């Protein structure tokens, strides 16, 4: 017995001595801001395995299996020598980082320990080495994740940002970059782990301190003027100076970028899959914003399934860091989706919706969404948690140029007799069509889609029964939806039937193609290539498999929507609607397979005053996109006859 104990002791001593030879270093040990790169180097890894991995931890005392993310050492071309390096851009999580290297082999894979995509999570049995701590300069104090939104007042702009502490902050702003004399005091709020509804959001695996969210309203703005601003305090430090163009009530022009279901990319593997295509969406929209020049107000509209954090709170930090180059320049408006709100005990869950609303929020139940954004209006609903804050940003509206924009919630009560229905009815009936001849309604789950997702059939039926009569009666121009991760444009439709071009029924578009990739290509059956799995019905004018976004441009006479693909940054589909409601292009005219002109052609519509600038931007953007693109789905976006089978979204 004693001999066996000694044998076991010396065995573990031997294993320890083998594994203890590894060393790790990081450079630099202090980063300035989110997005800065750290280089992690290691050496002395004995008998390296292609499953050896680098764990990323914040805060530094996190248990081994509570990583932020990981990278396999085999990502380094020299890993087989036992040495290598990996470069990572990091986001400021308001706490320090450490990095740990683990040895892992095929024989140690636990098939029951899986991530969201059913891939095995890495084993933590054999720790080889751990780095010193890495910190961000002014990590707690620095304001980050800056994003703008409109308020209910035409002469205001809201700015929201995050810091590590709740001490006093403000926004200072002005018309001259070095003369920011106007002050707006910021209000700080936060949420806690007990406000979350279930795991992983309320578990130690998914929870990280979200910091303080500050909200300041810049008031008394002149209309159509570029303002400069920064946020922070003299005591704690200031952000960089950003700028925006204020709303202009006298302008007839409306410019917007619109999409759903974008998410964000992470430079590491984590418990849930990141959305690599979201990088291209941000890149092309940023190109378009910069091409507009200095005097045009623009909005971004993200209609649900925002970050796809699903209970892993640091993903919200990654998301806001990714969109800050856009959202610090133009208002970033949102509506709630299933991955922000849904949980099993949500207050409104009628019998017909028993299989519609699940646990897609990962236990967040609308709390981070409600705290991190502040949209116009004052719509609220209870989360269903005794301690939880109310859900906000559910339904609201505002005017911009010639368009009245309306946002609704498909995750909370929208039936006749409810608060949201009353809001929508009153709002649509009170639109001044001489001022805003176009009305655009947006929500997450689609009223119309050729997806055969059985789980959502009941909600589509209820939306057509309760909401569609309001849209038709009040001559809504366009209805935009997400949730299905593809682009699809319908005719001017009512009760599943196309009307005449001049009748003025709403044109419905599904635009959930900004990043989420959980749905594969619609392809014909192998033994029946002439028969698509989901045939395109007569009321579906165009279906596209290319990731991308929508551009909206409108004046008093005409509204144009263009579908821009991420692969090439070019326009793949266009629909134009007159103020009378007549659809004058993009109708069912026998040209379903055609594109509606090149990017330079669209520039004439989109940037009438700056076509030459846009053409240069397109050429530059095309080559940047081509060079930076790592992968491309074969045939995607080339024709609407290359069908894509829409599978059920992950549950």
Curated annotation (Swiss-Prot):
The lineage of its organism: Eukaryota, Viridiplantae, Streptophyta, Embryophyta, Tracheophyta. GO terms for molecular function: acid phosphatase activity; metal ion binding. This is Probable inactive purple acid phosphatase 9. Substrate binds at residues 338, 483-485. Coiled coil: none annotated. The gene is PAP9. Belongs to the metallophosphoesterase superfamily. Purple acid phosphatase family. InterPro entries: Calcineurin-like_PHP_ApaH, Metallo-depent_PP-like, MPP_PAP, Purple_acid_Pase-like_N, Purple_acid_Pase_N, Purple_acid_PPase_C_dom. Residues 1-20 form the signal peptide. Its cofactor is Fe cation; Zn(2+). Fe cation binds at residues 305, 308, 485. Keywords: Glycoprotein, Iron, Metal-binding, Secreted, Signal, Zinc. It comes from Arabidopsis thaliana.
């Amino acid at each position: 017995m004693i001999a066996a104990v000694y044998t076991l002791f010396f065995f573990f001593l031997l294993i320890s001595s083998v594994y203890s030879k590894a060393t790790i270093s990081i450079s630099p040990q202090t980063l300035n801001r989110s997005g800065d790169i750290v280089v992690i180097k290691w050496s002395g890894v004995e008998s390296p395995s292609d499953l050896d991995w680098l764990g990323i931890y914040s805060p530094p005392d996190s248990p081994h299996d509570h990583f932020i993310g990981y990278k396999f050492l085999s990502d380094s071309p020299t890993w087989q020598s036992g040495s290598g390096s990996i470069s990572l851009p990091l986001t400021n999580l308001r706490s320090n980082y450490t990095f740990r290297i683990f040895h892992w082999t095929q024989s140690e894979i636990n098939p029951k320990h899986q991530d969201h995509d059913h891939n095995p999570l890495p084993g933590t049995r054999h720790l080889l080495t751990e780095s010193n701590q890495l910190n961000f300069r002014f990590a707690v104090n620095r304001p980050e994740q800056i994003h703008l939104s409109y308020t209910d007042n035409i002469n205001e702009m809201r700015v929201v940002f995050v810091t590590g502490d709740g001490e006093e902050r403000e926004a200072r702003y002005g018309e001259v970059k070095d003369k920011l004399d106007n002050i707006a005091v910021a209000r700080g709020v936060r949420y806690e782990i007990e406000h979350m509804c279930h795991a992983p959001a309320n578990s130690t695996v998914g929870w990280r301190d979200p910091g303080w969210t500050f909200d300041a309203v810049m008031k008394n703005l002149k209309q159509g003027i570029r303002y400069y601003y920064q946020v922070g305090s003299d005591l704690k430090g200031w952000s960089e100076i950003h700028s925006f163009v204020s709303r202009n009530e006298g302008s007839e022009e409306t410019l917007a970028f619109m999409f759903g279901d974008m998410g964000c990319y992470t430079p590491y593997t984590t418990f849930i899959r990141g959305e690599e295509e979201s990088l291209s969406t941000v890149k092309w929209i940023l190109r378009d914003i910069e091409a507009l020049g200095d005097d045009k107000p623009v909005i971004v509209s993200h209609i649900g399934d925002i970050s796809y954090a699903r209970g892993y709170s640091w993903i919200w930090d990654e998301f806001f860091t990714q969109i800050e180059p856009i959202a610090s320049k133009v208002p970033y408006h949102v509506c709630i989706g299933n991955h922000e709100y849904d949980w099993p005990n949500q207050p409104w869950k009628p019998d017909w919706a028993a299989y519609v609303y699940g646990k897609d929020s990962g236990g967040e139940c609308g709390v981070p969404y409600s705290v991190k954004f502040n949209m116009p209006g004052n719509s609220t609903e209870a989360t269903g948690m005794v301690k939880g804050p109310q859900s906000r940003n559910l339904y609201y509206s505002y005017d911009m140029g010639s368009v009245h924009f309306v946002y609704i919630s498909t995750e909370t009560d929208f039936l006749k007799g409810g608060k949201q229905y009353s809001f929508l009815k009153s709002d649509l009936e009170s639109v001044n069509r001489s001022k805003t001849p176009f009305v655009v309604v947006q929500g997450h789950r689609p009223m119309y889609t050729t997806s055969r997702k059985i789980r959502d059939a009941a909600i589509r039926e209820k939306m057509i029964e309760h909401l569609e009569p309001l849209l038709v009666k009040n001559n809504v121009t366009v209805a935009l939806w997400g949730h299905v991760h593809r682009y699809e444009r319908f005719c001017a439709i009512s009760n599943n039937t196309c009307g005449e071009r001049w009748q003025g029924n709403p044109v419905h578009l599904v635009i959930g193609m900004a990043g989420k990739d959980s749905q594969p290509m619609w392809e014909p059956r192998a033994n029946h290539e002439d028969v698509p799995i989901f045939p395109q019905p007569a009321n579906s004018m165009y279906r596209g498999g290319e990731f991308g976004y929508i551009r909206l441009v409108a004046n008093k006479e005409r509204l144009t929507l263009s579908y821009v693909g991420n692969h090439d940054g070019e326009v793949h589909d266009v629909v134009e609607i007159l103020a009378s409601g007549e659809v004058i292009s993009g109708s069912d005219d026998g040209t379903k397979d055609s594109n509606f002109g090149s990017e330079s052609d669209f520039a004439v519509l989109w940037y009438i005053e700056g076509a030459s600038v846009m053409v240069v931007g397109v050429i530059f953007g095309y080559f940047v996109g081509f060079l930076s693109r790592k992968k491309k789905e074969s045939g995607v976006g080339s024709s609407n006859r290359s069908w894509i089978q829409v599978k059920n979204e992950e549950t």
